[in-house]
Amino acid sequence: LPVSAREAYENPFYLEAIRGVSQLCNKRQYINTVITGESEEEILQVIKTMARSGQVDGFIVLYSRQDDPIAGFLYNEGFLYVLVGKAYAHANQTIYIDNDNLLASQEATEYLYQMGHRRIGYIGTDTSMIFSADRKSGYQTALLQHNILPRADYCVEIAASEKDSAPLRCLLSIPDRPTAVVVSDDILAVTLERVCLEMGLSIP
C-alpha cells in the first residue's frame, strides 16, 4: 500500500483490491501480508527484510508513483512484482495492470462540456501518482479539443495525506468559479461534496 495506512484504508479502491487479492490467495492456499507505513523509508525497510528472508515469492504494489524507491528496489534486485497502475520506469520489463485513466478523464470532461459547461475545474491528488497525472492530462486534452485553455486557478492538486480543504474553498470562492468539476477519485469527491454543502452550494 502507499504511504500512510490511514488514508489507504479509507480509500475504497485499496480495500476492494486487498479483498480481491486475499480471496484469490486463499483459493490458491497462498499467504499474503499487507505492507504499509508512515514513510517510504519505513515501507522500504520492511520490504527489504521480507524480500531477503527468502520467504516471499512476489509482491503486488497497489499504486504507481513517479521515481518510486520501492518499485525501483524490487526491479533492481530482480524480485517478482506486479504494479497496479501504469509503470513509470522500465515499462517494457514490468508487469502492470492499468485502466485508461487518460480516456476516462477525457470522457468525463467531454460529458460536462456536452451538458453545457464551459468553466470546468479539476481536483486531483498530486501528479507524482501516475493515475492522477493521466487524469489531469485527459481533462486538459478534452478542454483543448474545444479550444478552451485550461486555467491554472481551476486545477487543484492535494496530496493523498492532505486533510486541509482550504484549496477547495479557494477554488469555489473565486468570482467566476467553475460550474462543474472533474475529480480524480472518490475520496476527493466526497470531500468536495462536503465543502460545497458547508458553503451553501447546491450539487445537482
Model regions and ranges:
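Amphipathic helical "hinge" segments at domain boundaries
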Residues: L1-V46
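Short, contiguous strand/loop micro-motifs
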Residues: A5-Y9, T33-G37, A51, V56-G58, ...
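Bacterial carbohydrate/catabolite-sensing allosteric modules
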Residues: G20-Y30, F73-L83, A87-P204
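Short, electropositive alpha-helical surface patch
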Residues: Q45-G58, K136-Q140
